[in-house]
Amino acid sequence: DSNGMPLSHQFCEQLLVRAKPEHAVLWLSDAQGVELAGGLGLSLRDFARLGQQLVDARSSRNRSKIPNWFIEALVAPPALRGAEISGLGKGSERRYGFVRLAGAAQRVALIGGHGTSLYVDFDKRLVVATFASYPGAHSPAELALLEQVWKAVERGSGTVK
């Protein structure tokens, strides 16, 4: 990182603390800031609140809870061609622990362990927080399923094809 602070510490100090979670938060990292066991443990409600705060920060000039640089970094147009994320649309890329999803819309996801995810569509002001227990660790099938669920919710449909 450019300021010498590990990403996990930035996330905790500049984002998570400002979000003021309602329930206990678990963050596991080693002394160098490397996440352990998936790193973050939030209640589903606090996970969804974090997503809503991201949406509110993007659509408002008052970004006191979310640093301006963080929102802009998440929604910036795709950079140079990075490593493909198997299971997600071509052009999806990792940013600050999130995934900027492929396509024209300003959409990001935070994908946790075993399928838990936070999907944020800034253009539609849509937040979807899901808790899951999928018996694997970020397989392409899991990521493809999550992407289909997000698309179905976005369409307002209850079916996934």
Language-model features, listed with the residues they occupy:
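Non-transmembrane alpha-helical segments in soluble domains
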Residues: 12, 16, 48-55, 71, ...
